[in-house]
């Protein structure tokens, strides 16, 4: 599951990327409940959290000074998952657009 910022993903390349994600069968929602949906988190296997400033973009990978950390801790993963589910509940299901 992925939650993305609604306002920051209206450009052509963002829509193309979101369509690709949706076509792959990955659940995707857009969130406009906040000025910016700025979370950058991966929660894996209910016990590993990756977070940091890294935007999961080519620019972040090749040009910017970024950071990311992975922590294996079930309690932390649970807290991050609760935060994610809150954002998920506020999001709107993304519909493919061509």
What do the predicted segments below correspond to?
Residues 1-5, 29-30, 42, 48-51, ...:
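Structural recognition of the beta-strand scaffold that forms the well-ordered cores
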Residues 1-27:
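Primarily the HKD phosphodiesterase
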Residues 10-15, 38-40, 60:
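Short, charged, surface-exposed secondary-structure boundary motifs
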Residues 32-34:
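Short loop/turn motifs at secondary-structure junctions and domain boundaries
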Residues 37, 44-98:
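Signature of lipid phosphatidyltransferase scaffolds
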């Amino acid at each position: 599951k992925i939650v993305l910022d609604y306002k920051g993903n209206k450009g052509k390349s963002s829509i193309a990327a979101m369509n690709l994600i949706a076509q792959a069968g990955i659940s995707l929602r857009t969130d406009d409940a906040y000025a910016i949906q700025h979370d950058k988190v991966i929660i894996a296997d209910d016990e590993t959290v990756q977070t940091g400033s890294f935007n999961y973009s080519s620019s972040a990978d090749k040009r910017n000074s970024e950071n990311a950390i992975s922590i294996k801790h079930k309690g932390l993963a649970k807290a991050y998952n609760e935060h994610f589910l809150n954002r998920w509940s506020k999001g709107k299901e993304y519909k493919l657009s061509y």
